[in-house]
């Protein structure tokens, strides 16, 4: 299948302060983004891709300096792929507070000239959506043909239909939920605590000390990675396989292949991800709850939505189970909204939304065909 080839990141800077849900404001900020495909004459074929916790604006294609830098959803987006860049103008944007180029904790605080660190304001899903809307304003795009996201990205897609209902034609919400369960909040808290209690964290101002709280980041990633996989997929990939033929009878050495894998994932993550960003994004996950202002009534919260919806879940995803997706579907049906639902039998757990499953991609391809057919001709 034809690929996008080399792509280039772009930037857009904003001097007008972005009001945040916390009551604070983000001033003089920059958003990094990428686009794929061509915006049509009436600017009606734009699709926004919202990223999850440790992803970025680099959704598809590769960079010229590294053919190994494939975008995180490259199997989905490109010429002839389910989200076909021959038909759609696709936008990926890095959210404020992240660590992949948009203004975040590693950037200078205009008030001090030093990195924000822990002083970066707390951001929410709603704040990200408002920042994305400003980016679209700058690109001259009044309305999206569709917005799509998986996991935390799905929460952003849902939020788009509530905060800017007139600007969204279709919303594709994949492997997501209307809010986090207590168990998910607990996982996030344990991961944050691992980072905060790392001696190299220095209350979030570790940049000035020339260190990185890698121990905490490693543990946080190991915890998170376990939740992204299903028991079946871990058993199939690792089982009880040992690293060597004989047991070492040690409490500290690596004995099992799954231990080695988790440590590898933790080591890799700690080399590129920012600790303060991890705290910010997991807290944004915790805070997302559109029904909160409606006494917990999700149907009432979604009444303002005008988009058409596709909701997708995966049978072995225990972090955001199919039950959570069905909550969204029911609330939309309560409001007589146009919603399609697909529950994909897949063994891969939460990470299934990132993989090239033929049934899953078949559903997305068919739905984007519908979106394309509704574009002005």
Swiss-Prot record:
Gene Ontology biological process: homoserine metabolic process; methionine biosynthetic process
Span of domain AB hydrolase-1: 45-356
Molecular functions (GO terms): homoserine O-acetyltransferase activity; homoserine O-succinyltransferase activity
Subcellular location: Cytoplasm
Keyword Cytoplasm annotated: yes
Positions bound to substrate: 221, 351
Main subcellular localisation: cytoplasm
Assembly: Homodimer.
Role summary: Transfers a succinyl group from succinyl-CoA to L-homoserine, forming succinyl-L-homoserine.
Protein name: Homoserine O-succinyltransferase
Organism: Leptothrix cholodnii (strain ATCC 51168 / LMG 8142 / SP-6)
């Amino acid at each position: 299948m034809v690929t996008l080839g080399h792509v280039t990141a772009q930037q857009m800077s904003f001097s007008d302060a972005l009001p945040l849900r916390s009551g604070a404001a983000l001033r003089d900020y920059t958003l990094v983004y990428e686009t794929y495909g061509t915006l049509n004459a009436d600017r009606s074929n734009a699709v926004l891709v919202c990223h999850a916790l440790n992803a970025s604006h680099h959704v598809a294609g590769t960079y010229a300096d590294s053919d190994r830098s494939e975008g995180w959803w490259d199997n989905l987006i490109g010429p002839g792929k389910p989200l076909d860049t021959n038909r759609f103008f696709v936008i990926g944007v890095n959210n404020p507070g992240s660590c992949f180029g948009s203004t975040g904790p590693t950037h200078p605080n205009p008030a001090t000239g030093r990195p924000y660190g822990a002083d970066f304001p707390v951001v929410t899903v709603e704040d990200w959506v408002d920042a994305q809307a400003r980016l679209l304003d700058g690109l001259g795009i009044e309305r999206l043909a569709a917005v799509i996201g998986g996991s935390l990205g799905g929460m952003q897609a849902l939020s788009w239909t509530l905060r800017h209902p007139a600007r969204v034609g279709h919303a594709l919400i994949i492997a997501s939920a209307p809010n986090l369960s207590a168990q998910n909040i607990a996982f996030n808290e344990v991961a944050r605590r691992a980072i905060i209690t790392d001696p190299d964290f220095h209350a979030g101002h570790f940049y000035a000390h020339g260190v990185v709280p890698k121990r905490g980041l490693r543990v946080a990633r190991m915890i998170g990675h376990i939740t992204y996989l299903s028991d079946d997929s871990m058993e199939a990939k690792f089982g009880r396989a040992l690293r060597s033929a004989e047991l070492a009878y040690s409490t500290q050495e690596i004995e099992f292949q799954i231990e080695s894998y988790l440590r590898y994932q933790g080591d890799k993550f700690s080399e590129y991800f920012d600790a303060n960003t991890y705290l910010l994004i997991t807290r944004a996950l915790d805070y997302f709850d559109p029904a909160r202002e409606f006494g917990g009534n999700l149907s009432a919260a979604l009444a303002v939505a005008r988009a058409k919806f596709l909701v997708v879940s995966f049978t072995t995803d225990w972090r955001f189970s199919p039950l959570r997706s069905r909550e969204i579907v029911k609330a939309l049906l309560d409001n007589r909204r146009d919603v399609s639902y697909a529950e994909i039998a897949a063994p891969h757990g939460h990470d299934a939304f990132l993989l090239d499953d033929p049934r899953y991609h078949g559903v997305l391809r068919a739905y984007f065909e519908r979106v394309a057919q509704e574009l002005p001709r």
